[in-house]
Amino acid sequence: NGIERVEEDLMGKERPGIYDPYISVYCIEAGAKLLQREHFDIMYLTTTDFVQHKYAPGSVEANDFLSKIDYWLGELDKLGAIIGVTADHGMEAKTNADGTPKVRFIEDLLNQQCIPSRVILPITDPYVVHHGALGGYGTLYLEDQSQLTAAKAYLQGLDGIETVLTNDEAVTRFELPSDRIGDLVVLADASTTIGRTPSWHDLDKVKEGLRSHGGEYCQVVPMIFNKKLKQDYDDRLVSGTCRNFDLFHFLSNGF
């Protein structure tokens, strides 16, 4: 973005690591200091969800983190910025009664039924300390298309699996591109995650508890503004029909 020497000239301090809860605070603080230095028509500040993965709402750690985010949002407000805050997903605890991660390794389970498949987990990214590549959504490709009905019925009967959709059903229900999803789409319940095989995941990263997202229980997200919206936009906001990608439209036209 053409911004150089952030640590040396803008912030005067070292950037936190990716697994430091305060890397997100650093980002919002940097945005405020940039706006102090020069004018921008639009600023997009994106944070990590490390704290939300590791600490439940109301915990000391979560409250401390959010209070610091709130402070720097307040500094942006003082500078005259119109601020919109949203998220790409919610977050839920995904654990058994003993606190261990609750996982259904569906590729392994299907193999045990002589139904070979390849499971794709969209949550997979380099940041396995966050979530161990475990979330509530998975899609899979079958080696043998004639096993589609049997695979769907088997998965639907598993504890912790709430919904199993064919490609066509998932396209219609979730507005997904047909060529980017597999033969089946699998959604877990609120407290369960979907994995591939036990050997594919490093559960040591989440052995002290797992909070993650995916499925249909993490769809509701906040949309917060620091200025009063026009009445028609306010009506739309409280109607419950907005999507998080509507944020830019609201910021551009709603005041």
Per-segment meaning from a language model:
Residues 51-55, 92-95, 99-100, 194-196:
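Short catalytic/ligand-binding loop motif for oxyanion handling, primarily in non-cytosolic enzymes
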Residues 64-108, 186:
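Metal-dependent active-site segment of extracytoplasmic phospho-/sulfohydrolases and closely related
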Residues 1-9, 63-71, 102-122:
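Acidic, His- and aromatic-enriched active-site or binding-groove loops in soluble protein domains
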Residues 42-46, 84, 185, 224:
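Structural motif
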Residues 123-255:
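Active-site neighborhoods of enzymes that stabilize oxyanions during catalysis
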Residues 1-56, 136, 147-150, 156-163, ...:
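His/Asp/Glu-rich, glycine-adjacent segments
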Residues 91-116, 125-141:
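A conserved active-site cap/scaffold subdomain adjacent to cofactor or substrate pockets
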Residues 54-59, 234-236:
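Short acidic, glycine/proline-rich loop/turn micro-motifs
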